[in-house]
From Swiss-Prot:
One of its GO terms (cellular component) is small ribosomal subunit. Keywords: Ribonucleoprotein, Ribosomal protein, RNA-binding, rRNA-binding. This is Small ribosomal subunit protein uS19. PROSITE patterns: RIBOSOMAL_S19 (PS00323). Belongs to the universal ribosomal protein uS19 family. One of its GO terms (biological process) is translation.
Amino acid sequence: MTRSIKKGPFVDAHLQKKVDEQNEKGTKNVIKTWSRRSMITPDFIGHTFAVHDGRKHVPVFVTEAMVGHKLGEFAPTKTFKGHVKDDKKARR
């Protein structure tokens, strides 16, 4: 179930504050955050966020196509190593 339209998008207050400060100053420094649940709003466009994936911070550059999604969608938490090749010759 999606979030109600009347509630509006959820953005952590500390994250919005950091973006507003950078927009006022005109800087585009990397913003480190653990808030994967925050929705990307139009004022995030052009900023780079270091989103925590549980182990490290993954850099995410926000573009126009990302608006409406959550920051955590662009920082995968699991690394896929690939399937093990089925070696039938070694079993004999």
